[in-house]
């Protein structure tokens, strides 16, 4: 059991590292939309569930 847990944590850290690298690439592009999106988000948040909205956002960019 201990061995399984160790391997799992290792794979997770590797995935996280890869994800971070990808994020930095699009950071400059996303910064532009952050301000405009925040204002809109407050009104829309009530109507849509959080999970559904986040999925939609991801597809757009």
UniProtKB/Swiss-Prot annotation:
UniProt entry tagged with the keyword Nucleus: yes
CC per GO annotation: nucleosome; nucleus
InterPro entries, alphabetized: Protamine_P1
Entry keyword set: Chromosome, Developmental protein, Differentiation, DNA condensation, DNA-binding, Nucleosome core, Nucleus, Spermatogenesis
Summary of the tissues where the protein is detected: Testis.
Role: Protamines substitute for histones in the chromatin of sperm during the haploid phase of spermatogenesis. They compact sperm DNA into a highly condensed, stable and inactive complex.
Name recorded for this polypeptide: Sperm protamine P1
Taxonomic lineage of the native organism: Eukaryota, Metazoa, Chordata, Craniata, Vertebrata
Gene: PRM1
């Amino acid at each position: 059991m201990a061995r399984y847990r160790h391997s799992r944590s290792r794979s997770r850290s590797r995935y996280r590292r890869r994800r971070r690298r990808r994020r930095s690439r699009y950071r400059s592009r996303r910064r532009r939309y952050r301000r405009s999106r925040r204002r809109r988000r407050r009104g829309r948040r009530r109507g849509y569930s959080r999970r559904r909205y986040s999925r939609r956002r991801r597809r757009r960019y």
